Amino acid sequence: MHKQAKRYFLLGAVTFALAACGQGVDADQQGTGEGTIELAEFPDRPYWGDTHLHTDNSIDAFGFGVRLGPEEALMFASGQEVTATTGMRAKLARPLDFLVISDHSDGLGATRRLYDAPRLGVVAMGDETMLRWYDMMHESPEQSQRAIGELITAAANGTLPEAMTNNPEEQDAATAEIWGAHLEMLDRYNKPGKFTAFAGFEYTLMPDGNNLHRVVMFRDGLDRTGQVLPYPGINSDIEGLWDYMLAYEQATGGQALAIPHNSNLSNGLMFELTMPGGGPITAEYARKRAAAEPVVEVTQIKGDSEAHPFLSPNDEMAGFGVKGWELGNLPLTRETTNDMLAGNYIREALKRGLSLEEQLGVNPYAFGMIGSTDSHTSLATGDEDNFYGKHTGNEPSYQDRALEGQNLGTRIGRFGWHYLAGGYAAAWARGNTRAEIFDAFQRREVYATTGPRMTVRLFGGFDFSEADWDGDWVRAGYTRGVPMGGELEDRGNAPTFLISALKDPDGANLDRVQVVKGWVDSSGELQERLYDVSWSDMDKRSRVGGKVPAVGDTVDRATATYTNDIGAAELRTAWTDPDYVEGQRAFYYVRVIEIPTPRWTLFDAVRFGIELPEDAMADAVAQERAYSSPIWLKPAPPAIMEQQ
């Protein structure tokens, strides 16, 4: 085990002791009430949540101005009204079912401590950079944001002031106090059957500014999570995080998983074909990654990582959420070039995983897909008409937030309108409890949306047909096939998929349902194909040149409104792969596309009377979407194929 991983496990005894001194529940009551919740026979509905939310405990969020903490975050997500940092009253139209507060493990609560410190104490530390940041944080919101931008760049470049890194024992004690109080609060707000509050943190690994961040999510309550401290990203590596998670599980009997995010800002490093330090990926490394990271965050405020037009030129809808974010890494200190894109985007990673599995016998990139917000306002909302911004500096009270530059570094290129109002995670579970939702993540029976709450279901098998819709097709899906996230063993005939999509009951109609297939061909080359398998008005929208025509557009740009006069409320099909080849390794996932609707930028333009630039106005209407987790088709062992 990495020494650092061991250190952060052993220090958890301090956390647990501090938390136990507070108002927390007894250790032996972890998960109280979960055993009394009546569970469905099969997962019967998607539970909606956000696994990536920051509060004033995050070093950047506080510096960017947020003054709401974990309690306000839990209140807001569970449907209560709160007052945003800028003074506006904020409430979700529909509460979430679960939440992971994922404050950065590095410097947990540090900017608040620096801000609250007496200036003479900072002067006494003898570091000019820290004193300058302190003064900037107190000068104005704009200067505070600039200070945090410098701090993040310094962390990425390994140039943080020594005063911030040379006293780990003091930092650990401060972290333990904050972490313990946070865990106690989560257990108080966790209401099995009504609202699930998960412990978690963000591991912020960022070599040279390239985003390799993960959210760590725990299945457990205070009695187990209180035995660890959040694992830091500074001066560590990804295998150290996995060792930390394994040590936690072995010592406590608990469970943890890691969720990579913003691969689009990794400059090709997130889904490499080599080890992080160079050389070919080993089977051991692939096994560790597959075990630790069953899902990936595909969409969020800082862009969408599903696909890129350069990698998928035949997919006319591959450019969603790409603008601005494809320019470079997170702080824009390094440009992104075309040769890096394959390591940035999830469709390509899924394809690479097939190739690696053929070589190694294990697939390190066999992950499900979720969305989340990465909001730094303590407000988990992925709704276009209720978008509270990435951070406090672009909450709705700032009328020009769509036009302002959003650059942590010095290069110009990203603007407020590049932010997406999304996304959410949907978990198919038998009930709203920590155990049920976490287990759905673990088995990859989850899907992502860019904000709307569409209901998407996917089953794969070998004997499904349209006739199954007339019976209990959900039972058929589970008993005769596998759900999204599952694996099928090749039987020598083409797989068939039961695909069902229902519109968000409070949202837009559906344009189409697509299947994305990736495979390794007989020459060992990676291939992909996109199939339109069901769409609205199929009798009127016949294919032209092999393509389904556009659904139309009802958005009124002058009022930021649309109508559901086009599209369909429900789309479903039993689809059989027409290009199946026996023994071919493949994956299939579903992409559900809505009709065009206004983005938050258009709502702002109408609300505040703003004239958007031409490029922003062209992007002010979008087709929101959902991405299912894949189903993998694996070659049967030779002995089985010979018997068939």
Predicted regions located by residue number:
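Long, charge-dense tracts
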Residues: 217-219
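C-terminal functional module detector
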Residues: 22-70, 74, 81-131, 168-171, ...
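Gram-negative bacterial Sec-dependent N-terminal signal peptides
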Residues: 2-23
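Aromatic- and acidic-residue-enriched carbohydrate-binding clefts of CAZyme catalytic domains
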Residues: 123-165
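Conserved, charged catalytic cores of large soluble enzymes
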Residues: 222, 232-236
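Acidic, metal/ion-coordinating pockets
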Residues: 240
